[in-house]
Amino acid sequence: MTKLRLCYQTVEFGKTDIHLCTLRDKQEFDDPQGAAEKLGISSASWPLFGVVWPSSMVLAHYISDYNTGTKRILEIGCGMALSSLLLNKKLANITATDHHPEAGLFLQRNAQLNEGLPINYAQVGWADAHDDLGLFDLIIGSDLLYEEQHVALLANFIEAHSNPACEVILVDPGRGRKNKLSERMIEFGFNSLH
């Protein structure tokens, strides 16, 4: 991470501050060992995980007032994991996931910045058949549907990790694929309220 230009920022949720170390901008790139390339992450898409997107802010603001109780929560495609960091402040049972090889390092760094407990993290792709994440009561994510093939992959991943009464909260900026995802989830027995 030392070759990257970084940015530090604080996001406020009422009386709760979340401190973030992010990439300075969407032009950063550092993959000297080719780890991202081996996962199919191009240099153009490499920095997308490392900035806070508007959809992430919307999800975090929504989840800040959400009563998580004792629910086991999974954030998929966490990127900078703003919602996971906020839920961690609330002492929620959160696991964050992302496909990007650097996301876990930034999550660890940001959890320390916020003086919180370590956050469970798994580097996993939606097509990965062998993960041991288990089942969750609440699955959250934002701005996930970049490409057409993501619809089926995401739907199958959510179905594979959902308890029978699982709630799914996804924020989409209008990339044109949310209706297809909703249709797939309805086929799995979910209800859609979008």
Which residue ranges define each predicted feature?
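S-adenosylmethionine-dependent methyltransferases
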Residues: 1-194
